Amino acid sequence: MCANSAWAGDVRIPARPFLAAGDILERVESGFDRWFGARANPLRHLGALGFYLFWIIVASGAYLYILFDTSVSGAYPSVQSITFDQPWLGGLIRSIHRYASDAFALVIVVHTVCEFVHGRYGGFRWFTWISGVPLVWLALTSGVVGYWLVWDALAQFSAVATMEWLDALGVFGVSLARNFLTPDSIDDRLFSLFVFLHIGLPLLLLLGMWIHVKRLSQPDTQPARALAWGTLAALVALSIAVPATSAAPADLTRVAAILALDWFYLAPHALMYETSETTLWLIAAGGTLLLALCPLLSHAPRAMTARVDAGNCNGCRRCFADCPYGAISMQPHPDGRIGAELAVVSPELCAGCGICAGACPSSTPFRSVRELVTGIDMLQLPVAVLRARLRDELEQLTAAARIVVFGCVHGADVEALRSVDTGVVLLLCAGQLPPAFVEYALRHGADGVVVAACPEDGCAYRLGARWTRERLLGEREPHLRARAARSAVRMVYCGRRDLRALQQALNGLRAQVPAAKRGNGGVHV
């Protein structure tokens, strides 16, 4: 089910390619917010959780490698010794290594599905999406090879199945599966290759993960303490309750009849034997191709990029610091002044979110110039148009208590709030709002201001809601000036269907309008 794009003045309400699925996902994310809080919500920090699990896998794997015998004859006994001779150290660490790997695979799948449902795979996001596709293969291969090192019956089954699958390509000249026909066909050299792969592939995976987030400013690679400790506690509890153990030793003269598969990594083997090697290749190749083509299948319009005005850019670097996608660089100013810099926007990286315009110190509506031009601005919604729209909204309010709502087009439907006492100004992102506009609204007749942002840690442009909050609280430049009536300002985090929180904020302001006019308390966020 698709939703058509609509125009709200100069602000385009984004199309939602998977409307029903997106609504369900947002409800689940909101439910997790209530249970865990936004900062500890795993669904809002899947990338950070993936990095965290990767380092747990590396740390636990390093300990296991110290005690591991890399020979064919010594591999299985050494793993058994680690597991049973030191159950509360080696055995626990082995189980954590196993379950962290499973959790890593699960996080990759959920992260991919969530980003796809949210439509975050096309346009300026194409590189991040495409660079994530090889990570799926690297993670899967690393996990499969890790099972081989145990060299039990499950490892034998997985190794033979993998070689039979590769043999189906017919490009190796000789059968790889023949290396596993007799016990004598496996030697220490081949096993050393397995060890090399299990160490080398994660290194490539780490490199790929770095490339994956390379275009992001301040990427979310470290989960909040609550999420980190909670994840570690869950892994430890699971490891104690259901310790990871080995199957019987590998025996190439026999084929195991019953095995307990790890479905996170070894499910393709079962699928291959239920169908055929060719079928599995078609599924693998088709799935990879489909993922790689997703950016081309996106119908999202190309974002209009930010525009820099050299005459008004003073090289303050605020837009450079606040851009979520590293689309802004600083270069020498063309006027030739020593040390002067000019912001330069990369069209390929620009998301068209307007966060840079909200960061620009010249984006203030109090300027008395005839034509309001800022150092950096958005063509589809310039600051001058934003000021004119705010003035129009204030003039149309006729009630005793007058409130202005600044709303992000990716968040709640703030247009539904428009009434005789409530004006609405749409933004490309909450981060596009210069704090001076809040003070301007209050000084030109508004009794209260509500800033409606995306859910906390769920901003459509990653950092917009966060920067807005910090600007209003005076923690980030440009900040809301102290002389503004801060008690009359509310910032609300809300999803597309969440008008209740906005209504509560409006009702609270209506009830506190007299107090807001008198006092100068803190901004409510």
What are these model-predicted stretches?
Residues 1-18:
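Short, non-transmembrane cytosolic segments of multipass membrane proteins
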Residues 25, 31, 35-66, 78-97, ...:
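Membrane-embedded alpha-helical bundles of multi-pass integral membrane proteins
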Residues 51-75, 402, 406-417:
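Conserved oxyanion/phosphate-binding beta-strand-loop segments in alpha/beta enzyme cores
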Residues 98-103:
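Individual alpha-helical transmembrane segments in multi-pass integral membrane proteins
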Residues 133, 147, 158-161, 231-234, ...:
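Iron-sulfur-associated redox domains of electron-transfer enzymes in respiratory
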Residues 299-311, 366-385:
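Membrane-interfacial segments at transmembrane helix termini in multi-pass membrane proteins
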Residues 311-314, 350:
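Short Cys/His-rich zinc-binding micro-motifs
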Residues 318-351, 355-379:
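Iron-sulfur cluster-binding cysteine motifs and their immediate structural context
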